Amino acid sequence: MKATQIIQGDDKHKLILLEERFARCVDFHKKYNTEKKFETRIYYPVKLAYENYHWQDILKKLLPKGIEIPGGYETVGDIAHMNLSDEQMPYKNVIGKAILDKNTQLRTVVTKIGKIEATYRFYSLECIAGEPKYDTIQVEDKVRIGLDVSTVYWSSKLSTERTRMVTDFIKDGEVLCDMFCGVGPLVMRATAKRPKMRALANDLNP
């Protein structure tokens, strides 16, 4: 639930929702009256429903005691990419549905199965919620990259490193040789930003 709520019929003010333990604290109230210029304090009843809870809070209610709540997932386009443990796998569909329900921009939730053993270094995946489709569009720095997460290796965590290389190292007029390019995110981003450069890209995975 958002901590800031609109006030019907009042465009100049908003409600800031605090936990009751903070709202009852005189020192806290005085401090934020001064720093944030709160005008008044009221009690605001809140009716909590499924849509008000974060997906992890929902799983805390649904999963058996002792089962670890997933810490997060990687987003690739409109696909949530998870790495569930053996103890979490029996509840994979519950976990996937909670994530899908709370993230309307997502279409599919998948989890890795086993280790990387394929020649082309991609994971075996299982769809645990949503559409069983693995093709998606990942956008990095306004560049649209099409990929199938079931047939290629992809890591969104490398986006920061690609940004650093394109910004700090690759210059106009140079030749970029990426011999292990994957689906080519570095080459595509570099040539989009620096049209006067040349690029050579290759990967074992056709």
Give the positions of each predicted feature.
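SAM-dependent transferase fold signal centered on methyltransferase-like domains
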Residues: M1-P206
